[in-house]
Amino acid sequence: ISNLRMGKLDRSLLNFYGMFSYGQARNLYATQEHDHFITGKNDSWYYARQPHLHSTSELLRITNKMLIYEERNDICLAFGTPKAWLEDGKAIEVKNSQTCFGPVSYKIDSNVADNKMHVTVHHEANSSTPHVIKVKLRHPDGLPVTKVEVNGQPWTEFGQEVITLPAGQTDYDVNVYFK
């Protein structure tokens, strides 16, 4: 998670996929405390390698942080998503994720064949409001964001991959264009 927060996404993804490829019992699909490093044996029902609640919950926590996390007074969406998850025709959807600022839902629809993506965000405000909501969109071919529309209006608060949405609204309809 530290790598994700520091913007070192390649390292973060290496950790994420490493937990899947090495840290799971092949016949149980749950993480375990350890494997035998020399033989690679990972019999999931051996007393020291039983399903390990801490490791499994850590994998869930990392997945959650890849999709949504809070940084001080901001909500950050999709900051840890691999480019492959945003290939043409794919979608990412998060429903009612709990934050300090109330539940947040969002959906990203990729249409990168036409160099665009569509994002909807719903934030059920509670007594506290985030300063901003940031959405990170990593184009599979590395193309930068060139134009953004928020709720049908031109929007200028964006960088190469990150769109910064204003606080105080509950619904956002965002069209993002790449070139």
Predicted regions and their residues:
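Non-catalytic C-terminal accessory modules of carbohydrate-active enzymes
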Residues: 2, 9-179
